Amino acid sequence: MLRISHYLRSLAEDAPTPRRAGGRRAPVVIWNLLRRCNLTCKHCYSTSADSDFRGELETAEILHGIDDLRAAGVRVLILSGGEPLMHPDLFEIAAHARQAGMFVALSSNGTLIDEGNIQRVAEARFDYVGISLDGLRETHDRFRQKQGSFDAALAAMRLCREADIRVGMRTTLTEENAAQLPALLDLMRELDVQKFYLSHLNYSGRGRRSRALDAHHRRTREALALLFERADEDIRQGRDSDFVTGNNDADAIQIGRAHV
């Protein structure tokens, strides 16, 4: 993970980053609570679908697992899927993690967040809700293989902001959406979304069959340069934003490029 905004702020402060006692940082755990999902996205690394899958953990086992993670020093838990909002005990699970003292985030496609449950989402006190947006309307709907999913995701972001929930936009970079990245970042500001997470294609599940969609190296370099530019703008203008990338440690090479 490359924390672009964090890195640029540390440069602006002109102070060394303090070392943590003990040397190693506590791990961040992304827990796919279930594989069931209401979408069949082209890039899905877990090949999720709207059906039951055998062998998944019972809620009691999940709660016990959270206790084990906390005992092992895990402080950050991201609840994902599948679509985590399809888990019948999601809010109980989130509450248990919060009671254990964890930072608890939700990673969702956003289509199941609506006026009927936004209050419950707010009451769960997620520290962060990440909602996927993989291009503008036509591109996103084609990528997610469901018409209307773009509008539903945007509506979810607006509802989260109105409920004072910290929300982020999550985008998987592909050849199909790379040219739309500037527009997505403009949309981020328009919606007052505080975080942007750029993911690279994971070659697993349906993502393995969609490798031809992966962004070429030039596209990736251009995207990273743009994220550095937008992050720097926001810092200079005092905006509360956070730009992060994931699924490719080579992104850190851009740090050198940004200062040549």
Regions found by a protein language model. Name each.
Residues 2-128:
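Conserved alpha-helical substructure of the radical SAM core
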Residues 36, 51, 84, 111, ...:
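Residue-level marker for beta-strand->alpha-helix junctions and adjacent short loops that shape enzyme
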Residues 29-31, 77-79, 104-106, 129-131, ...:
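Hydrophobic faces of well-ordered beta-strands that scaffold small-molecule active sites
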